[in-house]
Amino acid sequence: MPVYRLAAEHNAFPPAEGANEDGLVAVGGDLSPQRLLAAYRSGIFPWYSAGEPLLWWSLDPRLVLRPPALHVPRSLKKAIRQGAFRITFDHVFEQVMHQCGAVRAAEGTWITPEMEQAYLRLHQMGFAHSCESWLMDENHRYQLAGGIYGVAIGGAFFGESMFYRQPNASKVALVALVGHLAQQGYSLMDCQMTTQHMLRFGAVEMPRSVFLEDLQQAIAQPIPAGLWQTVSPLI
């Protein structure tokens, strides 16, 4: 299948079903809020390294987590019950995203400064969100221990990346995030590519064609955009 070069003058994407065998749909374009939102609504996401052109992907199969189907491992339930972690939403979005890139810097990261600024704009518009986990240090001050960020459109949440500085910190943030999604009626969390980590939490692979159908129903849900800073965590 051909890979399309995106035109600069409009934000439309070719159909995700036209991706090549690796899942690549298109190259080029920019990271404007309008283009990013159009991509997510089409089941497409950006993923590239510094120095490369912008690359846009739609993988087949697609890994998806239904929020009510979240599986929390027994050992993690114990860590949550101990209550050491404090959970917040959208308090330090920029810091969470930067840390997600920093922990992967040695092996190469797609979270470039350009990407950070693009998603910060989405965050300021109420579409991109973070969930943070904090641990108290020896001076009784809470320090950022882990977090996760992604994009929300209607009843779909697109998980982008997570990081941790302390054991279980990102996992607790994930459980808190998915709990919030379930409470608010979100239909799906797009995990993009298959990992054993997310499979353990109840995510399942689905054909891209099925994912795209489910996605259109999810983004049509009347869940408004907006910051989550006042959300009370369920854990």
From Swiss-Prot:
Listed EC numbers: 2.3.2.6
Keyword Cytoplasm appears in the UniProt entry: yes
Catalytic activity reported: N-terminal L-lysyl-[protein] + L-leucyl-tRNA(Leu) = N-terminal L-leucyl-L-lysyl-[protein] + tRNA(Leu) + H(+); N-terminal L-arginyl-[protein] + L-leucyl-tRNA(Leu) = N-terminal L-leucyl-L-arginyl-[protein] + tRNA(Leu) + H(+); L-phenylalanyl-tRNA(Phe) + an N-terminal L-alpha-aminoacyl-[protein] = an N-terminal L-phenylalanyl-L-alpha-aminoacyl-[protein] + tRNA(Phe)
Gene Ontology annotations of biological process type: protein catabolic process
InterPro entries, alphabetized: Acyl_CoA_acyltransferase (IPR016181), Leu/Phe-tRNA_Trfase (IPR004616), Leu/Phe-tRNA_Trfase_C (IPR042203), Leu/Phe-tRNA_Trfase_N (IPR042221)
Cellular location(s): Cytoplasm
Gene Ontology molecular functions: leucyl-tRNA--protein transferase activity
Keywords: Acyltransferase, Cytoplasm, Transferase
Main localization category: cytoplasm
Family per record: Belongs to the L/F-transferase family.
Protein name: Leucyl/phenylalanyl-tRNA--protein transferase
Organism, as annotated: Magnetococcus marinus (strain ATCC BAA-1437 / JCM 17883 / MC-1)
Top-level taxonomy: Bacteria, Pseudomonadati, Pseudomonadota, Alphaproteobacteria, Magnetococcales
